């Protein structure tokens, strides 16, 4: 009983983090990052207490545990053996007396220490969600939470577009010279908002699919259809072109995966389906007029002229020049912002402006973590997608509950979308997106064990109870 209280508390607190992080500027301010970290820490501590009281091991794959432990050890060593601290006033690295002089260490101790705290918590969340996903009830609750959070963020963005506000609703507009024009919803940068929406709207679509494919109540169908339409409209209203392109690719993938199922379910009510399609079309037209969809269309028209002169190309060349110096362990977690200016000044083709992130998460990870850390992160991320695909193909039809069979492909599709987005932007550097990616990876890795805890769990429990009853009667 006590262990269940701690377990339930840890899960509800985790759901609170899923709500808080996107609304708190996407986890891009120091305050929102600290609060999110504390909430995640509370959830993980309660989960560990629940494991100790119940005397059970977490239901996670061994390979996942090894990868998370290896990443924490490598990053922790880089912090422990840090070689310097970056002085922002004089733009110089101040040497430190480190433990091993000729062994790799971070070039900036404070940044790497802060980043590793966040990384350790997020890696713990991957394990936490892998364990949580073994429960069909909590898996469905997690699905609902993601759908509601995505719909709320999308609605905020649409309201801002419709009212023509100059800044996020609860913030005063800054002076014109420093005015932010790329915000959307609670995110300062529309690219991050688009990446987040592309993570959540496929799961909103899955809730619609589940509602129509099963005998759900009409109000459930109406609710999740509305949430899905709002989220899709927000993707269209957002001016991030990459997010819109990825959304189109995700929509095609979802239609290929679930289109035949929906067609079979809707053929029995053609008139209802036709009326619903007409209503959806009218709603989308109304949305387009209200949220000024002509703005993202104009950005598409002018994009061809900007591609060749985009400063990201210069930054990419500078970063590529720094790769040989990163070596096996990199410059240290989170140190791109202090390493890049040094190489940019020395470059023949300097990238203008200040670069906190590279707009290429893979290359930035290689610089910060080196080849060893980069390979481990790739195994965690892409290995999770591969594990999810293999589990789905092998166990979905004979052993998984219907909700798992619908959810898992959508999770993998969403992860592929953010992986593509990371080629030209920095979604994987934003804590709210990192949190949702960690959640999805936990679902993918946890699916390895769904064959043991899926539909057969309740059947085995009933058989065990019947066997014990029969044994007791015999005695």
Region locations from a protein language model:
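Membrane helix-loop boundary segments at the extracytoplasmic
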Residues: 22-29, 236, 362, 366-369, ...
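A membrane-periplasm/extracellular boundary helix in multi-pass inner-membrane enzymes
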Residues: 81, 155-164, 232-239, 243, ...
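Membrane-interfacial helix-loop-helix modules of multi-pass inner-membrane proteins that assemble, modify
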Residues: 79-107, 142, 152-195, 229, ...
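TM-adjacent membrane-interface loops and short helices in multi-pass inner/ER membrane proteins
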Residues: 189, 313-355, 362, 369-376
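Hydrophobic transmembrane alpha-helices and their immediate junctions
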Residues: 371-409
């Amino acid at each position: 009983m006590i262990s269940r209280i701690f377990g339930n508390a840890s899960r509800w607190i985790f759901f609170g983090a899923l709500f808080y992080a996107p609304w708190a500027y996407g986890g891009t301010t120091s305050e929102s990052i600290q609060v999110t970290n504390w909430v995640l820490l509370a959830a993980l501590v309660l989960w560990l207490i629940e494991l100790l009281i119940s005397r059970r091991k977490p239901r996670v794959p061994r390979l996942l545990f090894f990868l998370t432990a290896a990443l924490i050890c490598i990053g922790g060593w880089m912090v422990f053996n840090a070689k310097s601290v970056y002085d922002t006033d004089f733009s110089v690295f101040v040497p430190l007396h480190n433990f091993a002089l000729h062994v790799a260490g971070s070039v900036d101790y404070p940044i790497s220490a802060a980043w590793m705290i966040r990384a350790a918590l997020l890696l713990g969340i991957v394990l936490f969600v892998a364990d949580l996903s073994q429960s069909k009830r909590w898996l469905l609750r997690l699905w609902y939470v993601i759908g509601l959070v995505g719909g709320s963020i999308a609605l905020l963005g649409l309201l801002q577009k419709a009212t023509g506000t100059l800044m996020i609703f609860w913030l005063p507009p800054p002076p014109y010279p420093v005015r932010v024009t790329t915000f959307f919803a609670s995110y300062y940068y529309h690219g991050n908002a688009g990446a987040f929406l592309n993570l959540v709207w496929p799961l909103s679509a899955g809730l619609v699919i589940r509602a129509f494919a099963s005998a759900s109540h009409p109000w459930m169908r109406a609710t999740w259809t509305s949430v899905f339409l709002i989220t899709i409209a927000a993707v269209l209203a957002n001016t991030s072109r990459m997010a819109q392109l990825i959304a189109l690719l995700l929509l095609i993938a979802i239609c290929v995966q679930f289109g035949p199922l929906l067609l079979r379910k809707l053929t029995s009510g053609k008139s209802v389906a036709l009326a619903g399609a007409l209503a959806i079309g009218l709603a989308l037209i109304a949305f387009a007029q209200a949220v000024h969809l002509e703005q993202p269309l104009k950005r598409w028209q002018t994009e061809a002229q900007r591609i060749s002169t985009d400063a990201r190309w210069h930054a990419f060349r500078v970063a590529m020049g720094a790769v040989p110096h990163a070596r096996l362990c990199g410059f240290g977690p989170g140190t791109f912002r202090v390493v890049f200016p040094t190489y940019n000044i020395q470059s023949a083709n300097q990238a203008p402006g200040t670069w906190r992130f590279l707009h290429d998460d893979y290359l930035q990870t290689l610089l910060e973590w080196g080849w060893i850390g980069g390979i481990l992160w790739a195994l965690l991320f892409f290995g999770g997608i591969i594990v999810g695909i293999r589990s789905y193909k092998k166990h979905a039809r004979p052993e998984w509950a219907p909700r798992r069979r619908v959810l898992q492909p959508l999770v993998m599709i969403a992860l592929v979308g953010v992986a593509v987005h990371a080629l030209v932007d920095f979604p994987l550097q934003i804590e709210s997106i990192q949190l949702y990616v960690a959640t999805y990876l936990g679902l993918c890795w946890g699916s390895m064990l769904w064959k043991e805890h899926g539909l057969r769990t309740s059947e085995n429990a009933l058989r065990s109870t019947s066997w014990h009853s029969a044994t007791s009667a015999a005695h």
